[in-house]
Amino acid sequence: MSIVNTDLDGILPLIAKGKVRDIYAVDENNLLFVATDRISAYDVIMTNGIPDKGKILTQLSVFWFDFLAPYIKNHLVASNDKEVFALLPSKLSEEKYKSQLEGRSLIVKKHRLIPLEAIVRGYITGSAWKEYKNSKTVHGVKVENENLQESDAFPTPIFTPSTKAEQGEHDENISIEQAAEIVGKDICEKVAVKAVELYSAAKNFALLKGIIIADTKFEFGLDENNELVLVDEVLTPDSSRFWNQKTYQVGKSQESYDKQFLRDWLTANGLNGKEGVAMDAEIAIKSKEKYIEAYEAITGKKWA
């Protein structure tokens, strides 16, 4: 069974509903993040979900928050069920609510969000490859190496920010100069440097586990001292492209641990961008298997 919506009967106020997460206010300082099993492709959310997807994303994010803790503070307050439920109203421990929250919930501290998607690309693929083929630029910036092939590694990872769109709208790629206009030059520079540092640390670790992190998206907030804090989800198959190092081959697109099964199925059935679509059960199962494969490879733990 998958959980595509949560309903806490108003015990906590629902303040936001994203493509995957339902966000509730716990008190004036803290939020409850609940990762549902919703999945979207081509900016449309499917009517059914991938069983346990939200749990896998949550546990993988917790792993990476812990791994990156020497590099940056994060917004986690409580990340295991015992700690989470201890900070919630006792009524939410009733089975009706507990079954919606177990294994997929985090309590996080509120921060002032920096309104940028901090995207870091280590390998040339997707929209970056299309742009490079046409103009030898990525994100409007000339690339030094004019002989890159699809899926090649960049000489050094590059920061390519985008706007943070409301649900139902598209994130828009922007230049670093435009990003600096939105958040200020100082914060923009800090975000760029930190995002590349975090990506590089994670990429090097994942390579040891047989996973290539081709690119990823970070989100940051600011604490009371105007210091950067890592927020949202971190280095999951929803926010990153993960490739299998064993099958990696320059010069072509790579199979990734993400929504590719779903995208391919939608395309084959002419359902791109259509609302109200339910996945075939087989697609949901195959997608879950990919998420688990990524989780197990990176964490070294079996998914129970």
From Swiss-Prot:
Query: What GO biological process terms are annotated to this protein in UniProt?
Result: 'de novo' IMP biosynthetic process
Query: According to the UniProt entry, what is the EC number of this protein?
Result: 6.3.2.6
Superkingdom of origin: Eukaryota
Keywords on record = ATP-binding, Ligase, Nucleotide-binding, Purine biosynthesis
Q: Which cysteines are joined by disulfide bonds?
A: none
Question: Transmembrane residues, as ranges?
Answer: none
Pathway given for this chain reads: Purine metabolism; IMP biosynthesis via de novo pathway; 5-amino-1-(5-phospho-D-ribosyl)imidazole-4-carboxamide from 5-amino-1-(5-phospho-D-ribosyl)imidazole-4-carboxylate: step 1/2
Q: Which GO terms describe its molecular function?
A: ATP binding; phosphoribosylaminoimidazolesuccinocarboxamide synthase activity
Q: What class of enzyme is it?
A: ligase
Tell me the NCBIfam families matching this sequence.
Answer: PRK13961.1 (NF010568), purC (TIGR00081)
> What is stated as this protein's family in its record?
Belongs to the SAICAR synthetase family.
Its recorded name reads Phosphoribosylaminoimidazole-succinocarboxamide synthase
Whose protein is this, by species? Komagataella pastoris
